[in-house]
Amino acid sequence: MKKLLKSVLVFAALSSASSLQALPVGNPAEPSLMIDGILWEGFGGDPCDPCTTWCDAISMRMGYYGDFVFDRVLQTDVNKEFQMGAKPTATTGNAAAPSTCTARENPAYGRHMQDAEMFTNAAYMALNIWDRFDVFCTLGATSGYLKGNSASFNLVGLFGDNENQSTVKKDAVPNMSFDQSVVELYTDTTFAWSVGARAALWECGCATLGASFQYAQSKPKVEELNVLCNAAEFTINKPKGYVGKEFPLDLTAGTDAATGTKDASIDYHEWQASLALSYRLNMFTPYIGVKWSRASFDADTIRIAQPKLATAIFDTTTLNPTIAGAGEVKANAEGQLGDTMQIVSLQLNKMKSRKSCGIAVGTTIVDADKYAVTVETRLIDERAAHVNAQFRF
């Protein structure tokens, strides 16, 4: 049985190293792997011994914590209906722009994100008790990247406006939704922290069964927003938008004169519980574990308008191309805006984990019972790699 357990853990650790989410599982035997310190010798006392003091029971570890999520499995967390203008029904020509919102099927409902990445570098600090329990925290910085279909971000605009003017009416609302485009965003590098606890619950020879619980939080700002859409393509550096505001947006939305806007930021929260089994083989301690986690990315459903000019130049305020191929903007004529997309905007919808369960496989290398390096990969609910290097005082 021992040989079988050794074979399974070693094979899993080595074979997974070639395939690289945001909280690692960690080695379940970590609280008891480093039993000696660089400044103070370890003490393996009995907690029931009346002569044992808390000074003998407590030790500290510090080190580097790196977690690199290459693809988190996310989906949107939105309502089934979305308020915007009625869908156009005219077969030819233009029509009056809608001025009232109606409930339509939300194209963002249940959408899967194409890519979600997060990279964290932090300092790791752990308080160890009786070489069996760890209470730890990380303090560092994180940055992220999100990419998805434009429908996931409720990219909308107004098409076919029959007005004879260089701007749309004040009460006009969008009537078209885009689902054949791509939206991507990059966040800045911002402060991130996490706390957790880990315990070696059961030991039998060289095998250890352990459990852990962790919570992480960060709130990065959106550094750059790219909308890759043939009808309305644009890029915004440090975008700002409206929170809690329904259509119609102000006519100044997207211009330098816009008011009532705030910086776009994403509030990230995640909790995770895990159970793992390890087996020590001299310097190496491979392990395999399962985890249950829930992550949320909430940007307050901020709505960001396409950048445009406050006053028209050459009878246009944006560089959006013609849709039906008119080839020119006819000034002082009905429908002069009808062939280009107007009042384009999108919103950053709340996202959550699409899968809750995942597996983690890794190994820890211990040197002189004072130093340790852990390498881990995680699969199913995310694809990620984790590195932890630490020493005991």
From Swiss-Prot:
Subcellular location, principal: membrane
Compartments it resides in: Cell outer membrane
Keywords: Cell outer membrane, Cell shape, Disulfide bond, Ion transport, Membrane, Porin, Signal, Transmembrane, Transmembrane beta strand, Transport
Leader sequence residues: 1-22
GO biological process: monoatomic ion transport; regulation of cell shape
GO MF annotation, one: porin activity
GO CC field: cell outer membrane; pore complex
Cysteines joined through disulfide linkages: none
Highest taxon of source: Bacteria
Subunit structure: Part of a disulfide cross-linked outer membrane complex (COMC) composed of the major outer membrane porin (MOMP), the small cysteine-rich protein (OmcA) and the large cysteine-rich periplasmic protein (OmcB).
Function as written in the Swiss-Prot or TrEMBL entry: In elementary bodies (EBs, the infectious stage, which is able to survive outside the host cell) provides the structural integrity of the outer envelope through disulfide cross-links with the small cysteine-rich protein and the large cysteine-rich periplasmic protein. It has been described in publications as the Sarkosyl-insoluble COMC (Chlamydia outer membrane complex), and serves as the functional equivalent of peptidoglycan. Permits diffusion of specific solutes through the outer membrane.
Similarity comment: family membership: Belongs to the chlamydial porin (CP) (TC 1.B.2) family.
Protein name: Major outer membrane porin, serovar L1
